[in-house]
């Protein structure tokens, strides 16, 4: 029984395919410039999950930016609706955040997260990428 358990634990797909999210971006942008961030995922199919962008300014709480659904439709926070676009490429396993007209107050750690059930429940987060807006 132990041998069967050992084989199952170490060779089952769920153990082999770790599920990760990794954000990447420029690090620093100037005021009025545009920001483009990429979230690269592995271990699961983007087409099966809603993906969110969230940020946390220094010393403040988390702020939801927006979501792209499995079919590609998006919802953006009202305060950012005119500045943010979220897209994805299922084949490349990448989700993109485009934010225009960057301001100093947009300085924050930016995260992508996977929604596993309706109601903004997140089971996997990236480690985040820091974006600093400075001249």
From Swiss-Prot:
The Ig-like domain, residue ranges: 20-128
Signal peptide: 1-18
GO biological process: immunoglobulin mediated immune response
Keywords: Adaptive immunity, Immunity, Immunoglobulin, Signal
Keyword Signal included in the entry's annotation: yes
GO terms for MF: antigen binding
Listed SMART domains: IG, IGv
PROSITE patterns on file: IG_LIKE
UniProt key word Signal: yes
GO cellular component terms, semicolon-separated: extracellular region; immunoglobulin complex
Coiled-coil zones: none
Protein name per Swiss-Prot or TrEMBL: Ig heavy chain V region XIG14
